[in-house]
Amino acid sequence: MANGGSDSDGPDEEVEALARALATLLNPSKIDGVVNCCVRAVHDEAWEGPRMGLLHVRFGEDRPRVEDLAYLLWSECMYYALPRRRQERFRREIASDMTAVARCYRAVRDLFIDFNARHPERASELGEVLAYCLVQEHLGAAQVASKMSLKTAANMPVHGLDGIHAVFENGALTVYFLESKLASEGRRGVASYAASAAEFLSDRRQYLREYEIVADLGNLDALEGEARQRALDHFDVIGHPELRRRERFVGIICHSEPGHFGKRLRIRDDQPPDIHERDFAERYAADYGKLRLTARKQLLKHGADPAKAIVLLVAVPDVRELRKAFYAAMGVAEREFPLDGDDLEIDDDEGAGGDPA
């Protein structure tokens, strides 16, 4: 559904202004302090997609820092859940009155509590916040619509994308459609993501609705002047089909990896403390070929284009324990839900045979 065409022969001043304006919507993040990337999602001339990155929770010597990751993700909710203008208002209030910190915390927490009360059958917040952080950090794309605040509005549908991010690069606006998954294993998360990608990409009505959300209710209202109008034009796919834009569907899959995490080196004082993290990263990275082949097979199986997909896999010892720690950091009662992909049939040899690339 990406549009071609050209609105200029090269990057003019207006285009550069748009790129700078979108960059101002990026929020600071410390996700790399608790999540390590052992394989980056880079372009590969010998591979037709999807791009895939492998990440994992960092270690504190020999122990995965699961609680630290949970706390960091809850802290990032201050940026993830609040619309840009409300963030700016809280910044001004906090600058003059430190008690506003408590009001900001309560406002974010209330959004999650309200969402849980309205939709007790859904529990996707952890994955959505993780997706927000990683797409900002590793794709350099700013959030252009706060989906959590929209989901708590009475007249807004709860179903839809988990996030929409954008960056102006290589002469075009790149729009990232985000889908997050919490899975018992990487393969199941990939299969669930592929099914969601195909469902969204085949639904023209929902596709247009997501663009309308950005234009009407998103963070672009925090921009000013010509840059704001140019951004709105780029998200108007009906009124301005001639503008350069590309679209990518990003799956962020946080999954349990008990096998690799269960193999630990002996504690040795004659070695640096990070040998445990480096050992895990090496073993996990060895799965890269079969995991991206699985992702390609699943995307093709569901009729999605692997060349327009990006998959980021995030390994933790037990995703249920991470979710439990996230709710504890938030200060709300834990809720138990099935994990994504548990209801799917996965062949035992899915992804076997190595990476043909």
Predicted regions and their residues:
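A short, glycine/Asx- and small/polar-enriched loop/turn
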Residues: 156-160
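A structured, charge-rich N-terminal accessory region that forms the first stable segment of a protein
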Residues: 10-103
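Conserved catalytic cores of phosphodiester-cleaving nucleases, focusing on short active-site segments
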Residues: 135, 163-165, 174-182
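A short acidic/basic microdomain associated with nuclease active sites
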Residues: 139-155
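Extended, charged low-complexity segments
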Residues: 268-357
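A short, highly charged nucleic-acid-interacting micro-segment common to nuclease
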Residues: 108-132
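Acidic, metal/cofactor-coordinating or nucleic-acid-engaging core segments within structured domains
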Residues: 191-278, 282-289
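Hydrophobic/aromatic-rich core segments of domains that either
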Residues: 142, 167-173
